[in-house]
Regions:
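Phosphate-binding glycine-rich loops and adjacent basic patches that engage nucleotide phosphates
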Residues: 1-8, 52-58, 81-82, 119-129, ...
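A short helix-breaking turn/cap at a secondary-structure junction
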Residues: 125-199
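Electropositive phosphate-/nucleotide-binding environments in soluble metabolic enzymes
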Residues: 34-38, 121, 155-159
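Structural signature of FAD isoalloxazine-binding scaffolds in flavoprotein oxidoreductases
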Residues: 113-118
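A generic secondary-structure signal marking the coil-to-beta-strand transition
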Residues: 7, 47-48, 120, 192-195
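Gly/Ser-rich catalytic/binding loops embedded in alpha/beta enzyme cores
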Residues: 1-109
Length: 199
């Protein structure tokens, strides 16, 4: 059995999950049903997760809220008058509402970090090239993603983030440049064990 055997999870709508629409919130792509899972989804499924749904995004992942004409508005589960952040706002809202225990988001300018903060959950924007981006691109877009674009997990605990990163990490044989995976074991167990740099 895999490390996440039986764990139910949702995935940000912009990821390919076989048999589901990947629209990036764009009505023009409403009928774009993907045939293959994104690489990170494959890795998590091989660890035993059960992907049972996809979560809302703003149009083209380009906003700090989570509204589009296809799926409507996602609100912050703690206060429906507030936004959950974006572009992984549906991901963070699903975690905060207790709908899911694990999520995958994406981040260029705060799209994991902002919703995690707004919804009181954990999110991690990892180092570029640590996790595979293939299967997370706009329909028909075969270009390489910008160097600042990464994917990463969201969860209800830092331990779950770390576990997900360990499963999802690894070189992409097509897109990665030089690659070396070296994730040390967690050393800090309390605030006294941490060093903080300020500049």
């Amino acid at each position: 059995l895999g490390a996440f055997h039986g764990v139910p999870m949702t995935v940000k709508e912009s990821y390919n999950v076989a048999g589901t629409p990947t629209t990036w919130g764009n009505p023009d792509w409403r009928d774009n049903v993907t045939q293959e899972d994104a690489e990170c989804v494959k890795k998590l499924k091989s660890a035993g997760v059960n992907v049972f749904g996809k979560t809302n995004v703003p149009l083209s992942l380009a906003d700090f809220q989570s509204y589009n004409e296809i799926y409507g508005t996602t609100n912050n589960p703690y206060d429906h008058e507030r936004i959950p952040g974006g572009s992984s706002g549906g991901s963070a809202a699903a975690l905060a509402a207790g709908l899911t225990g694990l999520e995958i988001g994406s981040d260029i300018g705060g799209s994991i970090r902002n919703p995690a903060h707004f919804c009181g959950v954990f999110g991690h924007k990892p180092t570029h090239d640590l996790l595979w981006l293939r299967g997370h691109s706009a329909p028909g877009d075969m270009r390489s993603t910008p160097d600042i674009s990464v994917i990463g997990p969201l969860a209800r605990s830092a331990d779950d983030l770390y576990s997900a990163i360990k499963i999802m990490a690894g070189p992409d044989p097509i897109m990665s440049r030089g690659y070396q995976l070296n994730l040390p074991e967690l050393g800090a167990r309390s605030l006294a064990d941490l060093k903080v740099g300020v500049w």
